[in-house]
Amino acid sequence: AVLDGQHRLKAYLELGLPLEDLVVIEPLNKGVAIALLIAEMNICTKTWKGSDYMAAPAMAIKETNAAFDFAMELQRRNFPLSTISFWACGNNKLKAKDLVASLKTREMPQCLQEADGWCAKSRKWFEAASEKFTAKFLAKKYLITFIQDGYNAADDASAYTSEMEEKLKNLTQWQADKIQNARKTSTQTQEQIILDLLREHL
């Protein structure tokens, strides 16, 4: 029902048809917009708890930017929202409730509006990393939070940005596989081992 409703809503928006003529279900609260109802269903229904949270906002938002487009690209690759937030915004501020709120305002969440500068850097890192790491590994927060911590601590952020891009490009496939295939041991968690390997090779 949720998917069917989204398809109908998208068709109405693309054809420029009046949304008041679209009937998905008979609402108990007629004051709730259909697009908002669909988004609420996506977020509150466990079946749709994965990557579908951005579909309805993407149809409703009037104007986007590079950060939003990057976030949508990652969403299509089934990245979780928390990881998308770090890649696209440089923080963990992008929340599902903000995307639902954007349906009412038809504006992007504030953290995406302010993220173009970060996104210009992180997209370069992502593209370089994608040549060596799998999407499954990049969908976890290990790499982007490691990069972000280094960026925040850098004396020269511009130099760090370029250096990290080069380091990612120069990473051998053997090194990348060693990092992304790391497993926990009796003395270290998987995260600790991955972070140690990232420090060693990047």
Regions found by a protein language model. Give the residues of each.
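Accessory terminal alpha-helical modules
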Residues: 1-202
